[in-house]
Amino acid sequence: MILAAVANGGSLDDVSKGVDFFHQLKQAGNYVPIIGTAATVKAGTTPVLFEWDYLSTSHGKDISGWKIFVPANATIGGYYAQAVNKDAPHPASARLWEEYLYSDEGQNLWLKGGARPVRQAAMEKSGKIDSAAAAALPKITGTPQFPTQDQQTKAGDYVAANWSKAVS
């Protein structure tokens, strides 16, 4: 929703333009109210998906002619949060796992899966990046915007309050 909002004149703080965009899709008969997957795309049920580029990258392996479009004016990023529970049975093992995830090897595994590693710039500079996997990523232009947790919460609240009347 945040991507649709930013692409249509909204912002990380104002997702109303995103809800309006989906309302316009509904009015035009182009909104399909199902969760799209590679299977629904193959079947022709959902010819367009709004999803993270790393998920779309995986569809290209299964769907002939699959294309990924990242709007230049609305590149939105997000991080996965990692945590170690101090009361875990083996917190040292959990810390080692975290170290592995953020090691060059772990980051290159994220990259091979189509995700953009958080340490990508540093790994490119040091020559530790898997250059073939990096080259396979969808091209983006512009600087990604990263919504804060507060912005995501407010966006979710707005969508919860306004979605059904927009697409019903």
PLM segments and residue spans:
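Extracytoplasmic ligand-binding site segments that recognize negatively charged/polar headgroups
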Residues: M1-T45
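Solvent-exposed, polar/charged alpha-helical surfaces in well-ordered, non-transmembrane soluble domains
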Residues: D20-H23, A39, A43, R95-E99, ...
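Loop/turn elements at helix/coil->beta-strand transitions in domains of secreted/extracellular proteins
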Residues: Q27, G44-P47, S64-W66, A92-A94
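Alpha-helix capping/helix-boundary segments
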Residues: T37, Y54-S56, G106
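A ligand-binding cleft/hinge motif common to bilobed small-molecule-binding domains
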Residues: K42, V48-G65
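Mature extracytoplasmic/periplasmic domains
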Residues: I76, Y80, N85-T143
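Extracellular/periplasmic bilobal clamshell ligand-binding domains
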Residues: G127-S168
